[in-house]
Structures are given as structure tokens and as C-alpha cells.
Amino acid sequence: MWRIWKVFDPRRILIATAIWLIIIALTIHVILMTTERFNWLEGAPAAEYYSS
């Protein structure tokens, strides 16, 4: 396993992983915010949604 770090720079791998996780998190949040059911800022409370 230690040989892989001779090929890849650990700093670049960690930075790339962090950027990738931020992009995925923002994408998931944007998708959820565009739906009526999961938009917690403009949507109705959960009780109102499930009662209709």
C-alpha cells in the first residue's frame, strides 16, 4: 500500500477528495431544494405534506 503514495501525491489526493465531496454535497442539496417535498426553506411542514 505504501508504494501507491510514491506514485500519487497525498496532498493532491486529499484536496481532490475534499473538493469532490463538496461538489457531491452541493449537488444533492440543490436537487433536494428543487423538489416540493424536500424544500425545507419554502415548503410546507412535513405534517401538512403527509396529511394531504
From Swiss-Prot:
Transmembrane stretches, start-end: 13-33
Residues that coordinate or bind a bacteriochlorophyll: 29
Presence of the UniProt keyword Transmembrane in the record: yes
Gene3D superfamilies (alphabetical): Light-harvesting complex
Periplasmic side of membrane: 34-52
Membrane topology value: Single-pass type II membrane protein
Keyword Mitochondrion: no
Single Gene Ontology MF annotation: metal ion binding
InterPro entries for the chain: Antenna_a/b, Antenna_alpha, Antenna_alpha_CS, Light-harvesting_complex
GO biological process: photosynthesis, light reaction
Cytoplasmic side: 1-12
Keywords: Antenna complex, Bacteriochlorophyll, Cell inner membrane, Cell membrane, Chlorophyll, Chromophore, Light-harvesting polypeptide, Magnesium, Membrane, Metal-binding, Transmembrane, Transmembrane helix
Domain of life: Bacteria
Subcellular location: Cell inner membrane
Assembly with partners or alone: The core complex is formed by different alpha and beta chains, binding bacteriochlorophyll molecules, and arranged most probably in tetrameric structures disposed around the reaction center. The non-pigmented gamma chains may constitute additional components.
Family: Belongs to the antenna complex alpha subunit family.
Described function: Antenna complexes are light-harvesting systems, which transfer the excitation energy to the reaction centers.
Name of the molecule in the record: Light-harvesting protein B800/830/1020 alpha-1 chain
